[in-house]
Amino acid sequence: MEKQNKVIIVDYGSQVTQLIARRIREAGVYSEIHPCIVTAAEVAAMSPSAVVLSGGPASVLGEDSPALDKGLLELGVPVLGICYGMQLLAHNLGGELSCSETREYGPADLKFCAGSPLWDGLKTDESSRVWMSHGDRVKKVPAGFTVTGSTETLEVAAMADDQRRIYAVQFHPEVHHSEDGVRMLHNFLFKIAGIKADWSMSSFCERVIKEVSEQVGPDDQVVCALSGGIDSTVVAVLLHKAIGHRLHCIFVDNGVLRLNEVDEVSGYLREHFDLNLTVVDARERFMKQFAGVEDPEKKRKIIGYTFIDVFDEESQKIPNVKYLAQGTLYPDVIESISHKGPSAVIKSHHNVGGLPETMKLKLIEPLRELFKDEVRKLAVELGLPDFIVWRHPFPGPGLAIRVIGEVTEERLDILRKADKIVQNELTASGWYRKVWQGFAVLLPLKTVGVMGDDRTYEHVIALRVVDSVDAMTADWVRLPSEVLERISSRIINEVKGVNRVVYDISSKPPSTIEWE
């Protein structure tokens, strides 16, 4: 079996399995995550250079706990077990486990008990801070293994069988709390597995362009829904390099986009990339649907269904359309498969809200192997400008869910102007690139104020600025008071109809990032 520079990660359900993949890719090595029901034969067909067994919430000693296909240990490639993965190795190879009544969660000081290529370059005469999250523990290592690390409360924190190149750690080297974790992973990849670091956005870009140009027939046409966000924009530019004007981008102006967004994005892409781009002005059509609607779920459905109708109508104007391109990312693929579920790739139209089956289009998902941070790197590789590369996430329903209550042209105008000030001030103060997301929300109430000698009764703007890694959790950002003061002052003075600005200091959970 000819080995490729690829690492297969077998997922046993850990919340940080994706972080293992990202750490490996950051080292310049391609990695894939597969559910723990993947067989050794399936992994062998992928020709990996190494295998990683992830952590997981189950107990190896439990009745229905995820099992190890021992054939994975016969592939002739190095294996690294992390947390649950270490316990699986010990249990299946003749070691002994003990069940703990309480979980060990948090930092621990790792002491190096024996030499190991995993510790290469580390100060083994000193302890190393690592992060633990486990219940069961290895009581006795299997035959052929050596205890290579311990902590004050854990006799076997790491073990190794150098002859079979099987290594295991009870802690999580992939999390940033483990201070030498990245070095340990690099040692596994380069010292133990001898992998060549050849994964880059440049090589990815070349491969995708080649694959798409071969996949799409000479007369086939491809449609792509452009939203102005980074994912769909990268898809469009990448496919344009592969098939040129056979790619048809459709940008639906739904009336709830940011200030000047349609002109800025479409103008730039046409000028610099010569995209075959159609902008559909459907603002009036969407706004009629919003009349009298206050419920956020109804607003979301209006956006989704109306978009589908408009996109379908425009697509049918293009002859010989065979493919739909969309910006599915790797986390979308992973999350669609339970770590216990079938090993299948998704082929759903989730990014565009479920396009009608009558379209009968094949999917092209050029970003389905990438994490969000890799998409940004690819955008830079493709020459996209900072205002697209570093644009904050924007919800599919747009400003419709940032106008709390009924969506009207007047209320949208107020919100757009206020939000533009927020973006400008975050950028001017150097905070825009430091935070995950920052935006304005128009509240469904008015308050009393004083301007000059007159009393006012006008709208309230809420400011929401959060920091996050993946949007699953988020914390409100402690912006400097002078930045908050400038934002508030400018909105009240420059946006007609607003006399109060409040700052949202809620974290997720329990609150969500968006208000609706």
UniProtKB/Swiss-Prot annotation:
Domain GMPS ATP-PPase: 199-391
Positions of the catalytic residues: 83 (nucleophile), 172, 174
InterPro entries per UniProt: Class_I_gatase-like, GATASE, GMP_synth_C, GMP_synth_GATase, GMP_synthase, GMPS_ATP_PPase_dom, NAD/GMP_synthase, Rossmann-like_a/b/a_fold
A molecular function GO annotation: ATP binding
Domain Glutamine amidotransferase type-1 intervals: 6-198
Group of enzyme by EC: ligase
Record pathway: Purine metabolism; GMP biosynthesis; GMP from XMP (L-Gln route): step 1/1
Residues that, per the record, bind ATP: 227-233
Source organism, top-level taxon: Bacteria
UniProt keyword annotations, A-Z: ATP-binding, Glutamine amidotransferase, GMP biosynthesis, Ligase, Nucleotide-binding, Purine biosynthesis
EC number per UniProt: 6.3.5.2
CDD domains listed in its UniProt record: GATase1_GMP_Synthase, GMP_synthase_C
Catalytic activity: XMP + L-glutamine + ATP + H2O = GMP + L-glutamate + AMP + diphosphate + 2 H(+)
Gene Ontology, cellular component aspect: cytosol
Quaternary structure and interacting proteins, as annotated: Homodimer.
Protein purpose: Catalyzes the synthesis of GMP from XMP.
Protein name as annotated: GMP synthase [glutamine-hydrolyzing]
